[in-house]
């Protein structure tokens, strides 16, 4: 059975997250098809939302990303600019997120996420218990 869960992307869509409202709007509008694994920001493969930045690094004839940590010397100022001017840098912003992004539609409080997960867990346990009672 399951012994854990990967939940990193969920925390990008909570009120308490340190990312910008513009990033959260981009996540809410995206589907899994809007993501790509790219080394263009960190030098290591990272799933993120596709945009003009990621497409430029994938364009034939353009240089390959450097390895980590050197690639961040190329992208670090761009990442800082997207945090400082999020409305003006949407097309080149670093928006790391998993393929689950298509299920993240609204910004919630962290406490609401935990309460929802507990409810969903209890509902699932109830359904499993009902299956055991059938036999």
Segments the model singles out, each with a brief description of its role:
Residues 1-135:
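Conserved active-site-proximal phosphate/metal-binding subdomains
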